[in-house]
C-alpha cells in the first residue's frame, strides 16, 4: 500500500477499520459470524516509512482453507467495487476510531510507543492533536476513491500455511 506520509493515510486507515480492523468488520462478520470458518479474521496495515503492507487473514480449519481464501478475495473485490462502503459503515468506522483513539495513550508503554512513531515516521509534533480533525475530514467519497485506487486485485498475494497435501488440491483450483 501507500507510505505513511501519503495523503490517503486517513481514508485508508478508516477503510481498513471497517474492512477487517475490528470485530464488526466485513471480514470478521463474513468468516466468523456468517460462515463460522474462524474465531477471528482481521486485516491490518503494517505502516512503514516507505510502501506499507495490508494484511488480511486468520486461523481457519484445514477443511475450509480454500473457502476462506475465496471469501477473503471476494471481500477485497467487494470493497473495491462490488459492494462499496455504505454510509452506515462509514459512520460506524469513524465513530469506532474516535471512541478508541484515547485508549492508545493509557499506559506508559503505549505513550512511549506513540511518541516513538512521531520520530520514526517524521510526523509533526501536533500529529496526535490533529488526528481526529484529519479523520473528520474524510468523506464517504474518499473511501470509495481509495478503495478503487488502492486495492488492486492483480497485486494481491495469497500466503497459506498448513498441511500442503490436504490444502493444495483445493487451492490449485483458484
Report each predicted region and the residues it spans.
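Short phosphate-engaging motifs
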Residues: 23, 64, 166-167
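PPIase-associated folding chaperone regions across multiple families
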Residues: 7-14, 151, 166, 170
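Active/ligand-binding-proximal structured segments within catalytic/core domains
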Residues: 6-19, 26-29
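Short acidic-hydrophobic sequence patches enriched in Asp/Glu that either
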Residues: 7-10, 23, 71, 89
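M16 family metallopeptidases and their MPP-like homologs
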Residues: 1-3, 15, 29-81, 87-140, ...
